[in-house]
Regions:
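Flexible "arm" and connector segments at domain edges
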Residues: 1-69, 75-123
Length: 123
């Protein structure tokens, strides 16, 4: 493994842990009253707004704005997962596992024995 790769992985792990711990604190006993009251349903309008803001950022061609809006959207995904975890429905880890399984299943040309000639053949 390249030294830079390990450092990047360590930083990624640290940042991910910091973000998930932040969300737990916001919804915890001494957390934010607004965050603690949120449900999947009450966050729907925020989710829709953030998706539109990501689309606008893509359209603007401004990478800094896109990064900011993706951060907001990513945080909402963490938020939804924490609400589910708090209610013993599923965890962030369950979502990540499901994502991994789904994407590997959808790409047999990469992770299986299937071969394709071009991008059109993938669809």
């Amino acid at each position: 493994m390249h030294k830079l790769e390990k450092g990047y992985r360590d930083l990624y792990t640290k940042n991910f842990k910091n973000l998930t711990e932040l969300m737990k604190k916001l919804r915890g006993k001494d957390g934010c009253p607004w965050d603690k009251e949120q449900t999947h349903d009450t966050l729907k309008s925020c989710l829709i707004e953030e998706v539109y803001e990501v689309v606008d950022a893509v359209d603007s061609g401004n990478p800094e704005n896109l990064q900011e809006e993706l951060a907001d959207l990513f945080f909402l995904i963490i938020f939804y997962c924490q609400i589910s975890d708090d209610n013993n429905i599923f965890s962030l880890n369950n979502v990540m596992e499901a994502c991994f399984e789904k994407m590997t299943r959808r790409h047999p040309h990469v992770f299986g024995g299937k071969s394709v000639e071009n991008a059109v053949a993938v669809l």
